[in-house]
Swiss-Prot record:
It comes from the Bacteria. This is Cobyric acid synthase. Residues 249-444 form the GATase cobBQ-type domain. Gene3D superfamilies: 3.40.50.880, P-loop containing nucleotide triphosphate hydrolases. The keyword Magnesium does not apply. The active site is at 330 (nucleophile), 436.
Length: 499
């Protein structure tokens, strides 16, 4: 068949473009089409590493899963990762440079060439490409340097669907205003509008839809109801890391760092009955959890200093002395050591900082970035978390720091190459690792949570059965696709795509 494409652009950030792309990808896949997602430029600290060691935005990984494809860095050729005064630019899956944000325009033409090459390669491998824009497509102050919205639609020669979010209010003004701000040639690309996150009686809303269509002379293809799906996407960051007051039988506190990255590490914990995940950034919020997790961060030293300044650092040390188990992941792992050195200014202007001193490791930042998928085994139980020794785990590493392991550190995780990628202290109260995604290993997470409950005298009435991660995700993608089919004019959408 001839190559087909369609692009979802938004009236603003967080209107649900990623979710709608995911929905359409799964629908088209279920129709037997060879479909793939594409986003020219992503801005996120929530990244992923492909099998060939290339880094890309997490949202396109989700969309690839909906297409039943392995994630491919071609799907997201440019990823911007803000870090303090600088932004790290990932191009074609590898670090391209660290740049001050105001200088980004200087890279525009270079990145545009890379984006076009990536799209051309991807489109040769698939029959249909579903593209996603970034933020608002009508930011007139950024138009000259924009490579991810209408400029990308032109490169792909893709028809555009404009998405707006009614839940935040002002949906009609945002749709009309967005279209009016575009030049005529770009307006002509918009073939339909989708109103997202609707709550209420659709029959009462229909007259307003007709009025809108008369004003813009573009059909509204449907109204998507507000519905929650357990799908990782950039728009869910705020929802996931908000502070929850309710406490289940097992209370896990995750430190909400200013530059926190890879929040998807903890998605599976949110799905386990009687487990409450609380994100905290003040000593008073920490209380007495059953487990403290310090997550990954794009600026380890700065976030460590922030914890010292607001006394959260002291509170964590106090809880450790009373026996509260602590787990650090990536940047959190580095913080648990004795010293962090950044003489090259990889993350910022602070050259060194003392860590918690819980683990006998010293970390030095290098310009070379480690990006790889990793499989390994748990080498020992922890004091509060037993029955995990011997568990097989898999995940991925994204870090500039290299940690030198001292004699007092106890090896906790060894990868299949024989390298130690995590250690614990001699009391086995504190542990850390470079592995993101380790909780997605079903055998490990089941034993981990069950043992943690038992250690805290929480009744475990039956084995903790966690639905296989891939099956769970698959069901959510199908549920999303079904809602999309029920509320969007699929016939008209296919006609726009010439399918």
């Amino acid at each position: 068949m001839d190559k087909k494409s369609i692009m979802f652009l938004g009236t603003a950030s967080s209107v649900g473009k990623s979710t709608l792309v995911t929905a359409l990808c799964r629908y088209l896949k279920n129709q037997g089409l060879n479909v793939a997602p594409f986003k020219a430029l992503n801005i996120s600290l929530n990244s992923y590493v492909t099998k060939d060691g290339l880094e890309m935005g997490r949202a396109q990984v989700v969309q690839a899963e909906a297409c039943k494809l392995e994630a491919d860095a071609l799907m997201n050729p440019v990823l911007l990762k803000p870090s303090g005064e600088y932004t790290q630019v990932i191009a074609d899956g590898k670090v391209f440079c660290n740049i001050e944000p105001y200088k980004y325009k200087e890279l525009n033409e270079t990145l545009k060439v890379r984006v076009k090459k990536a799209y051309d390669k991807l489109s040769k491998k698939h029959d249909v490409i579903v593209l996603e824009g970034s933020g608002s497509c009508a930011e007139i102050n950024l138009k000259d340097s924009d490579i991810s919205n209408m400029a990308m639609a032109e490169i792909a020669d893709a028809p555009v669907i404009l998405v707006s979010d009614i839940d935040r209010g002002g949906v009609f003004a945002s749709i009309v205003g967005t279209i009016q701000l575009l030049p005529e040639s770009e307006r002509e690309r918009i073939k339909g509008v989708i109103i997202n996150k609707f709550r209420g009686n659709i029959e009462l809303f229909k007259p307003a839809i007709k009025q809108l269509e008369d004003i813009i002379n573009i059909p509204v293809l449907g109204v998507m109801p507000y519905e929650k799906f357990d799908i990782d996407d950039e728009d869910s960051v705020t929802e996931r890391i908000r502070n929850k007051e309710e406490v289940g039988t097992l209370d896990i506190a995750i430190i909400r760092l200013s530059h926190m990255s890879n929040f998807t590490d903890f998605s599976i914990l949110d799905r386990i009955p009687d487990v409450t995940i609380r994100y905290v950034d003040k000593p008073s919020e920490l209380k007495n959890p059953n487990l403290i997790i310090i997550p990954g961060t794009k600026n380890t030293i700065e976030d460590l200093r922030s914890m010292k300044e607001n006394k959260l650092f002291d509170k964590i040390k106090e809880l450790k002395e009373s026996g509260t188990p602590i787990l650090g992941i990536c940047g959190g792992y580095q913080m648990l050591g004795t010293l962090i050195l950044d003489k090259l200014g990889v993350e910022g202007n602070i050259s060194q900082e003392d860590g918690f001193g819980f683990l006998d490791i010293k970390t030095r930042f290098n310009e070379t970035k480690v990006t790889k998928q990793t499989k390994g085994n748990i080498l020992c139980d922890l004091k509060s978390i037993k029955s995990i020794e011997g568990s097989t785990i898999s995940g991925y590493e994204i870090h500039n720091g290299i940690s030198k392991i001292g004699k007092k550190a106890i090896p906790f995780i060894k990868d299949l190459d024989g390298d130690i990628v995590g250690v614990c202290d001699k009391e086995r109260i504190v542990a850390g690792t470079y592995l993101h995604g380790m909780f997605d290993s079903e055998e490990f997470i089941s034993s981990f949570v069950k043992s943690l409950k038992e250690n805290n005298d929480i009744v475990v009435t039956e084995d903790i059965i966690i639905e296989k991660v891939n099956e769970y995700k698959d069901n959510e993608y199908d549920r999303l696709s079904k809602l999309f089919e029920e509320n969007i004019d699929i016939y008209q959408l296919r006609k726009i795509m010439e399918l």
